[in-house]
């Protein structure tokens, strides 16, 4: 993936993280509080139990912010269309869209279902899903 796409994806994720901070939270957190952990299989935990894996792509690494009630998954080898289909499937499973934004290089969405909030940022070949458990 070229540098421009990575920058667009990183910027979109940062915006989504900032927007998610607008809702009331008891636990402060920083996106830099965790190091990436390389994985090759879907992790089983309280966070990933709230969603399902995408049909396409491969999980690449995770960030464990569980002390702050958050967990991030990074995927590779999926098209922007695959990622959009995943967002649509999450909506069909009952997640409501709070907001979304897209441009030529990347897109993102904030979804919520009960006490689970999702921040999803994606571009060609990559997607990041941040899961937050609220309360």
Q: Where are the regions that the model predicts?
A:
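Classic N-terminal secretory signal peptides
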Residues: 12-16
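Bacterial N-terminal signal peptides that target proteins for export
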Residues: 2-10
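An acidic-aromatic pocket/loop used at catalytic or ligand-binding sites
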Residues: 23-135
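N-terminal hydrophobic targeting signals that begin at the initiator methionine
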Residues: 1-2, 23
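C-terminal motif of bacterial Sec signal peptides marking the signal peptidase cleavage site
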Residues: 17-21
């Amino acid at each position: 993936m070229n540098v421009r796409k990575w920058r667009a994806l990183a910027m979109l994720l940062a915006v989504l993280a900032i927007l998610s901070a607008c809702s009331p939270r008891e636990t402060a957190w920083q996106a830099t509080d965790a190091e990436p952990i390389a994985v090759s299989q879907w992790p089983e935990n309280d966070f990933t139990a709230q969603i399902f894996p995408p049909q396409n792509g491969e999980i690449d690494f995770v960030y464990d912010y569980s002390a702050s009630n958050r967990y991030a998954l990074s995927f590779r080898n999926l098209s922007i269309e695959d990622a959009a289909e995943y967002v649509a499937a999450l909506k069909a499973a009952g997640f409501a869209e709070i907001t979304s934004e897209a441009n030529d290089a990347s897109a993102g969405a904030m979804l919520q279902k009960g006490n689970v909030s999702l921040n999803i940022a994606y571009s060609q070949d990559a997607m990041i899903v941040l899961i937050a458990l609220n309360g």
